[in-house]
Swiss-Prot record:
Transmembrane segments: 5-25, 63-83, 132-152, 175-195, 250-270, 279-299, 379-399, 416-436, 483-503, 526-546
Source species taxonomy: Bacteria, Pseudomonadati, Pseudomonadota, Gammaproteobacteria, Enterobacterales
GO CC field: plasma membrane
Protein name, as recorded: Potassium-transporting ATPase potassium-binding subunit
Localisation per UniProt entry: Cell inner membrane
InterPro entries: KdpA
Function: Part of the high-affinity ATP-driven potassium transport (or Kdp) system, which catalyzes the hydrolysis of ATP coupled with the electrogenic transport of potassium into the cytoplasm. This subunit binds the periplasmic potassium ions and delivers the ions to the membrane domain of KdpB through an intramembrane tunnel.
Coiled-coil portions: none
Disulfide linkage: none
Protein's organism: Pectobacterium atrosepticum (strain SCRI 1043 / ATCC BAA-672)
Family the entry assigns: Belongs to the KdpA family.
Source superkingdom: Bacteria
Subunit note: The system is composed of three essential subunits: KdpA, KdpB and KdpC.
Entry keyword set: Cell inner membrane, Cell membrane, Ion transport, Membrane, Potassium, Potassium transport, Transmembrane, Transmembrane helix, Transport
Amino acid sequence: MAADAFLLIFGLLLTVLIVAQPLGSGLARLIEGETGTLLQKFETKTARFFALDTTEMRWQQYAAAILALNLIGIVVLFVLLMAQGNLPLNPENMPGLSWHLALNTAVSFVTNTNWQAYSGENTLSYLSQMVGLTVQNFLSAASGIAVAFALIRAFSRRCVDTLGNAWLDLLRITLYVLLPLSLLLALFFVSQGVLQNLLPYQHLTTLDGAAQTLPMGPVASQEAIKLLGTNGGGFFGANSAHPFENPTALSNIVQMLAILLIPTALCFAFGKAVSDKRQGHALLWAMALIFIVAAAVVMKMEVTGNPHLLALGADSAANLEGKETRFGVLTSSLYAVVTTATSTGAVNAMHDSFTALGGMVPLWLMQIGEVVFGGVGSGLYGMLLFVLLTVFIAGLMIGRSPEYLGKKIEVYEMKMTALAILIPPALVLLGTALALSTEAGRGGILNPGAHGFSEVLYAVSSAANNNGSAFAGLSVNTPFYNVLLAVAMLLGRFAVMVPVLAIAGSLVVKKRQPESKGSLSTRSPLFIGMLIAIVLLIGALTFIPALALGPVAEHLQFGLTH
């Protein structure tokens, strides 16, 4: 079993690294604005058609453009979901959503969270899935990558006050990266048996005479960008555990590759854009080491499972509850780590059915800000925030002015860094406290005790860190939870994005100092170790008390009870 786990983890990471390198080179060219003559003519015509201003933007203009696009997206999607009962491509006559569910869903997909307080096959029309959710999957992913592009330019440029053009970045990312990759991945999924049609649901009679309804729909096209864009919202309620979304072991492995592809490629792109590939490699080492340990722990917990089952006559103590037999314990455990280390939130097993400590690791991966690969764009700029914090602390320790890639890190950058790092944990802890201190919040808890607390903590952690996965034992389709989590998703996304762009705007105007003998090496094993330590320390100081009340207490209760 240990050998199988080793092969799964390292085989996945090795394949991702091989595939992501050429993509990273392409992304680096996009960061520098190198698109080629033919593509440049096409994007110029497209920009003219949409009347886009393609002049370079300062950070305030860049942030305003990103915020405006996302605000419009929330309004349009909200209206579409409310009105879907009166719109075409609705063969099952799905009614419009309630205002609070429509608000929650609109915010969820625009912020790249894809939290779902509904089951797609019972709630949404094909039009809502295609024109509403799938479009936002592209735009939210492009928004995150665009902000990462702006921050990378802040390090690669010097003595200018612009970060690029948000509209051109969004256009290029969508046309040259997300659409081609999604098309290829969707075709692969169709070859594996994922649905792609506009047929009405099929009503059948089984061999034993029972009635059965098989949902249909344009699944493969949404599934591709759901994974590549680290969105995670499933076409069906069971998400990637559903055989119409993830039918085979091969499709399951490819899904994990697709989730990790762009976050990994962005690290390579970062190194190439700043003319020091080892900087990108250092970030990847830090991410990969945390990922490997997290995956090993979850696999160990789920394989160990419940030893008391053996005394009851079970063939194995492994925790198979909530898992698909076509994937098994190890692959389901690895998928859980992949989807929570990134901001994806797609699931091929029910996280609520994991062991107490096995479920704690995905929860903790979200709580540290999803910087272990992270979401497309957001993972890179999230990890760079921790890099700046590490550089600052190291500078204090050795008595030197902190700098990163030749740019001095001063008071303003540290204020913005602290703000961006602390906002999501504050949202998690305050949101959980609010839910547990109100009748409306406690009313959604279906499981008493420590596990019920864990379900609330997981839900708010998932929303505030834009993940979207859930411990599904919590009843969240209520006005209280829909509004609470919508606010957490909005602030968790944009209250981090804006400080990141502010940091970029401050750094881009600075001179890039040459590296000297006294400069702190930010690509050495020592720095990688310090970076990992800072990430773990921030996570530990912030969340150990909450985790002790939830998963740890549940684990101890299990041991005492049995």
